[in-house]
Amino acid sequence: MPAPTGTDHPDITVTDSLGEHDVARARLMVDGAAAADGISPLSEQAVAAIDAAAGSGVRHVISAAGYANISPGRGDEPAMIEAVVDPQLRRRGHGRALLTTAFGEAERAGDARVWAHGDLPGAQALAASMGLVRRRELLQLRRGLGTGAPALPELIVDDSVRLRTYAGSADDAEILRVNNAAFDWHPEQGGWGAEQIAERVGAAWFDPEGLFLAFDAANPERLLGFHWTKQHDTELGEVYIVGVDPAAQGRGLGRLLTLAGLHHLAATGRSEVNLYVEGDNTAALHTYERLGFGRYAIDVAYGRPEGD
């Protein structure tokens, strides 16, 4: 299918950066859609990118009725579009016009996809009307930690592993090494640099006691894996990132690190925990389901059918 061109909505603007007024307008639309739908229309990264400076690589598509941003693809990975339409202006063709423009921009450099967070009926219908198909699924899993929830298995650390929490920037190089080895295939998680670590360490939710590091007892300087937890509010925690060095696979480190984080989140008083996992990552799904997680929601990336 050729890249879409043109639009019947001439007020749509494409730019490398947004002015202060447009940043505020985009954030209001995101907040309004989240309140209306019970789920944010944009990911954490896409929300942060709303006020990204020119030169960041992010492209913005904005109109009076909607907003989208385009994150460029890395290597063979597609560009990713995230979009929102003002809830009060839906079903008037604005979503289609916004995505037509966004795909037209994104596909100049290759393949592109658009996230539908929650895969709501309106998003499904819009995707179908544009000839888009499901190309990727990201599952949100949840389990309880509070009263009435299944008890967590005991945390048992093998003598071959040294488990501790984050000790500061001296740990960053090993975290980056393991992260980029574990997620070299991942469009968002792979290819991190020091700025990605600094951004998260500087976030309001960051807690060094919630970042678990597993080192090799025989080589204490070598990181085997890590688990970064996140606390969203007083009730909900998150298994944010679990990364294991591919060279250390098969030692049960994913389960160990996940369990360490779950015990920590339970100790902070969180009553529920969530995580995100690729829909086709059967090994990770099996691990999480054995730890009591169940499916809660789904995000779908829609794109052109393969071969178009």
Swiss-Prot record:
**Pfam families recorded for this chain?**
Acetyltransf_1
The UniProt record gives the binding positions of acetyl-CoA 2 as: 242-244, 249-255, 281-286
Q: Where is the N-acetyltransferase domain?
A: 161-308
Q: What does the record give as the reaction this protein catalyses? A: 1D-myo-inositol 2-(L-cysteinylamino)-2-deoxy-alpha-D-glucopyranoside + acetyl-CoA = mycothiol + CoA + H(+)
Q: Which NCBIfam families match?
A: mycothiol_MshD
Q: Which GO terms describe its molecular function?
A: mycothiol synthase activity; protein-N-terminal-alanine acetyltransferase activity
Cited Gene3D superfamilies: 3.40.630.30
Q: What is this protein called?
A: Mycothiol acetyltransferase
Q: What does this protein do?
A: Catalyzes the transfer of acetyl from acetyl-CoA to desacetylmycothiol (Cys-GlcN-Ins) to form mycothiol.
Q: Which family does it belong to?
A: Belongs to the acetyltransferase family. MshD subfamily.
What the entry lists under InterPro entries is as follows: Acyl_CoA_acyltransferase, GNAT_dom, MshD_Acetyltransferase, Mycothiol_AcTrfase
Give a GO biological-process term. Answer: mycothiol biosynthetic process
Enzyme Commission number(s) of this protein: 2.3.1.189
Q: What keywords appear on the UniProt entry?
A: Acyltransferase, Repeat, Transferase
Subunit structure and binding partners = Monomer.
Where 1D-myo-inositol 2-(L-cysteinylamino)-2-deoxy-alpha-D-glucopyranoside is bound, by residue? 44, 188, 230, 238, 276
Q: What is the lineage of its organism?
A: Bacteria, Bacillati, Actinomycetota, Actinomycetes, Mycobacteriales
Q: Which positions are annotated as binding acetyl-CoA 1?
A: 83-85
